[in-house]
Amino acid sequence: MNETQIQRETRQVVEDVLEKTNLKQGALFVLGLSSSEVLGGQIGKESSQEIGELIVETILGILGSRGIHLAVQGCEHVNRALVVERQVAEQFDLEIVSVHPTLHAGGSGQLAAFKFMQDPVEVEFIKAHAGLDIGDTAIGMHVKHVQVPIRPILREIGHAHVTALASRPKLIGGARAHYPQDAIRKS
């Protein structure tokens, strides 16, 4: 698999999703990543530390330049806990849990987050403003209600299917209420 191509596709998809979601500085962005799927394998079966590092480092660079916080979701073997910076866990009052990811429990994305973040910790749950799912890892449990599907510019990174979610405030009030337009709500 061509690493330059994977990096280019990752950059393209992330920048497109950020443009479509209109995330602000300080927002939380969740990443679900199967490096196995990126390489054309079955999720959890052919994990690649190199691919995890390439993708996470690329995404951290893009989000960091915009002041957006990354949370990297682990697999079911760590109960889908997430790696975030300690400062983010404290700022959002997230419960820190005790686990250190491995390639097959947490996955390559979490290992990469531990490598590239300043002070990484694992947290049990978050409510992200948006997120990217590379390889059908199921990030929905970590994105705020109401979730809005975002169709990225590319449908795959490497061989992995790619989807994205944004969130918008709930519409309440009934027939008499009026709602402001927002960038992601469908008309």
UniProtKB/Swiss-Prot annotation:
In its UniProt entry, the species of origin is given as Streptococcus pneumoniae serotype 19F (strain G54)
Transmembrane annotation, as ranges: none
Q: Give each disulfide bond as a residue pair.
A: none
Q: What domain of life does the native source organism fall in?
A: Bacteria
Family from the record: Belongs to the UPF0340 family.
* Listed name of the protein: UPF0340 protein SPG_0604
Q: Which InterPro entries match?
A: Antibiotic_NAT-like, DUF436
